[in-house]
Amino acid sequence: MLASQAIKRIFHRSWKPLVRFNHGKAPTAIESIKKRIEDIPIENYRNFSIVAHIDHGKSTLSDRLLELTGVIQSGGNKQVLDRLEVERERGITVKAQTCTMFYHDKRYGKDFLIHLVDTPGHVDFRGEVSRSYASCGGALLLVDASQGVQAQTVANFYLAYSMNLKLIPVINKIDLDHADIAQAEDQIENTFELPKEDTIRVSAKTGLNVKEDLLPAIIDRIPPPTGCLDKPFRALLVDSWYDSYVGVVLLVHIVDGTVRKGDKVSSAQTGKKYEIKEIGIMFPDRTPTGILSTGQVGYVVPGMKASKDAKIGDTLMHLGREQETEVLPGFEEPKPMVFVGAFPSDGEEFKALNDDVNRLVLNDRSVSLKRETSNALGQGWRLGFLGSLHASVFRERLENEYGSKLIITQPTVPYMIKYYDGHERLITNPDEFPDLAERRNKVQAIQEPYVEAIMTLPQEYLGNVIKLCDHNRGQQTEITYLNMTGQVMLKYDLPLGQLVEDFFGKLKSVSRGYASLDYEDIGYRDSDVVKLELLINGSSVDALAQVMHSSQVERVGRAWVKKFKEYIKAQLFEVVIQARANSKIIARETIKAKRKDVLQKLHASDISRRKKLLVKQKEGKKHLKSVGNVQINQDAYQAFLRR
């Protein structure tokens, strides 16, 4: 999701905030905004999100709406709500954002206050999505006229539908030569049971029908917020970001009551107390209004120092009125589901890099972090992420922000170990995996996490995709032909461990880029998994160990030893590379000792001296091998882990 150096403010912090204080608006302009908000009753509020697959035009449509309502100038902004560099480069949304708009509807002669809450679409950030939807009365279901319904659209539709949002189907990119509007309408009707006549056709790029049809539909079809101004104040914490000047900034939806600058509030989940230092709306940047009331979506600066204290889904309430304020339902702590080891490529850089990693974790409350030490790679960290995309985004941010070079181990997922005595243990590092003796005597079952994967693809690639899913231990649960044009929706139960092994890249490859994917966690299931280790002269290289299904270990083990052999230079002694699982060696490669001619300077007839030198060389090689100090360059680990 991103490409501009100027927009770097919401997700991390060693940069200058893009979600900045709105210095550009003079005090009179801010007073005018405050007065305009005061004059709009809650029944004229409209809060909505946009549900869309990647590249279906969500950011462009957001820009167009902001232009048409006068929030930004025409043509001067691109992807205003995608504030992270990674968001612009990848075309994804990572953090929830909001922007307030004023719209004068000439049909009614009234002003309306509209809050657009931009949400992440990827499953890794589903926590932000569900909290964003909870702030809204409706959503635009955006579908690309040239691509039709895609997996992410389907997954987010069901989430929005389950939260009782009023859905408005919108077909975008109708100006394209290859747009198939009729097909898109058929898919929307067949997949989501939304009538064709409710569909609005637009071009976000040109603005066609956005002002004429879409804005009036938002006013007419999306219901206003249902909160009560007279009840005790409570707000839903939708998202947060860190600002190097003011600390944590909270994105909130005011469910009931009113909150003002200077008010003292408390958190339902942490019990911590804060004083509101600044409060206002995003227009599109931070615009202080001094007050937020029922139904509004805006920001507060509570003087919070650590992002870890900003818990998505938390309830904020007035200090001293906690007993009479009902906590909002649905709060869940985010659970890391993908773990990697991270080590500096240069061990001497650990201290400096440690500061960088901790700074980024400060800005992303959903990353778990703990120090760990590898016998091969030295000091490093074990990082936990919401999913594989989250891990990828974090790594990219670290490299973009600091130019830091890390050795990142292969991603692993958590495994649940169930013991005969009834207790359970969740492991996140292959080093913690029980050995063969423990598994035989104490372990009742080992479980791995599963997901329900939703894929949409052209029918011609169905065979390839089914073969890929079967190869990755998938179990087909549903197949639906979306329409007569050949689009198919597949549902598979897949092990999460297979998904993080670049399943999406393989899916794109076998479908020539036409397949789309989304998934949802469905819990743990019993599995026959084992730990595969790489040994160098009998010593395990801990950083390279992986947990995988027993059916894969021989194939992967053979590939490992062949690949790692390419990156180890010949030593003065023989180097044996082995793959081991269940205490058995399943593959082996040998690097012959580098021969040194110790006889070069001897006279040809000096036979006894020759024998003595050869015996001495043999003893020396035996000693080196027994010590096992094989010299392995860090580049070898990096190259091997890029497999």
Swiss-Prot record:
GO terms for molecular function: GTP binding; GTPase activity; mitochondrial ribosome binding. Residues 43-226 form the tr-type G domain. Pfam families: EFG_C (PF00679), GTP_EFTU (PF00009), GTP_EFTU_D2 (PF03144), LepA_C (PF06421). PROSITE patterns: G_TR_1, G_TR_2. CDD domains: EF4_II, EF4_III, LepA, lepA_C. Keywords: GTP-binding, Hydrolase, Membrane, Mitochondrion, Mitochondrion inner membrane, Nucleotide-binding, Protein biosynthesis, Transit peptide. It catalyses: GTP + H2O = GDP + phosphate + H(+). One of its GO terms (cellular component) is mitochondrial inner membrane. Its main location: mitochondrion. Its EC number is 3.6.5.-. It is found in: Mitochondrion inner membrane. Residues 1-18 form a transit peptide. SUPFAM superfamilies: EF-G C-terminal domain-like, P-loop containing nucleoside triphosphate hydrolases, Translation proteins. One of its GO terms (biological process) is positive regulation of translation. It is a peripheral membrane protein. GTP binds at residues 52-59, 118-122, 172-175. It comes from the Eukaryota. HAMAP family: LepA (MF_00071). PANTHER family: TRANSLATION FACTOR GUF1, MITOCHONDRIAL, TRANSLATION FACTOR GUF1-RELATED. Promotes mitochondrial protein synthesis. May act as a fidelity factor of the translation reaction, by catalyzing a one-codon backward translocation of tRNAs on improperly translocated ribosomes. Binds to mitochondrial ribosomes in a GTP-dependent manner. Belongs to the TRAFAC class translation factor GTPase superfamily. Classic translation factor GTPase family. LepA subfamily. This is Translation factor GUF1, mitochondrial. It comes from Zygosaccharomyces rouxii (strain ATCC 2623 / CBS 732 / NBRC 1130 / NCYC 568 / NRRL Y-229). The gene is GUF1.
